[in-house]
Amino acid sequence: MKALKIIGLSFIAMISLGTYAQELDANLQFRPRYEYRNGFKSPMSNGEDATSFVSQRSRLNLNFKQEKLKAKLTLQNIRSWGDVSTTATADKNGVAVFEAWAQYDFSPNWSARFGRQVISYDNQRILGEIDWIQQGQSHDAALFSFHPKNHQLDLGFAMNANAENLVAPKTPYTTNYKSMQYAWYHTQFGKINTSLLLLNTGYEFEKSVGNLEVDYKQTFGTYLVFKDKKWDSNLGLYGQTGKNFNNNVSAWYAGANLGYALTDAFKASLGYEFLSGKDQDNTSLTVKSFSPIFGTNHAFNGFMDYFYVGNHQNSVGLQDAYLKLNYSLKKWQFTLTPHVFNAPNTVLNASNEKMDSYLGTEIDFTLGYAVQKDIMVSAGYSQMFASATLERLKNVTDAGNTNNWAWVMISFNPKLFSLK
């Protein structure tokens, strides 16, 4: 807390000594969340017990603006209640930098941003903030943006190392990607918003003893959004090619959603996603499984995180058909989303026989209540009805009959001050 006070006072001093028009906004976020996990991410085996815990995010956000200069600093502490003693002299995770960037606006249409920053576009299927996880997701990157009226072109660049090395390391860098470049373009044609993305990610690996190489994988595609008075829809199409650990990549993704507002308070949507995969009896070394690399994957394919949240990589792919029902009433919001999952590629049992493609059904229910402007209470309950095929994919034997997950979260977002 002493460090945070010093930082805050330093920013205030900058304001008082400045000679230009300046703005400084400071706000906090405290977000404790209780979770009950009984088959979260994978079916529970008989004999295993459910678990529960409380995690918390605590953030300080500072936003600075001075004519053509903008800057943001976000510090955070992520903890599980009880991970340190009540008399601890140091925190387990300490205070970390979530965002720390500066931006210069060359003109109303051109800007450049450097530093630790969130990179998030469209529906966050490929590039997202992952706000659900307490730590979120941010990148060390440079961003150049050209944004005249009705158009935006962003060019991003990143290169990573594990330290200020004096010579080239002898072991591969595996903390993250070694390098990344992307171009994102957005425009509007009437009622259709169109985005194009080209993303190039390079991962370092040891090809042979003492021989480090970087393989590059390309993700490219489009995201379209249509909105009318009562109708809205979106369509995402992406492909992946390149190399992954010296293996060729050939994968693709398609996702679509169609929504209709029956009343001002009630909306229904139908959606479908296809993520390519590979038959388990396919001996080819080609990577055919699509990977939503930096996406906010918790928001897709069920909230119980059975797919693509640190799992289900280089697997049989996924088909997800879902119905989403939204209802709002004054300060309340309710959402019910059933998902039906299928494997688009062959799954084999222990006898190498083809199994049924049906993976299971998940039902997600969430609600939210706005206590006041800066306080939000939300909760949810999810249940997965897993098939034998899904249990096989998750390598679970003797699975229990009930797999469910429940959570309650409170978000406090008070504004400390705003100086102009």
Predicted regions and their residues:
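Asp-box/WD-like beta-propeller blade repeats and closely related beta-sheet repeat scaffolds
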Residues: 127-131, 139
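Glycine-rich beta-alpha junction loops
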Residues: 200-202, 241, 273-278
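N-terminal secretory signal peptides that target proteins for export/translocation
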Residues: 1-2
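Outer-membrane beta-barrel and related beta-rich outer-membrane complex signature
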Residues: 40-42, 85, 126, 165-169, ...
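Envelope-exposed proteins and targeting segments
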Residues: 98, 138-140, 181
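Internal metal/ion-chelating core segments
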Residues: 146, 151-235
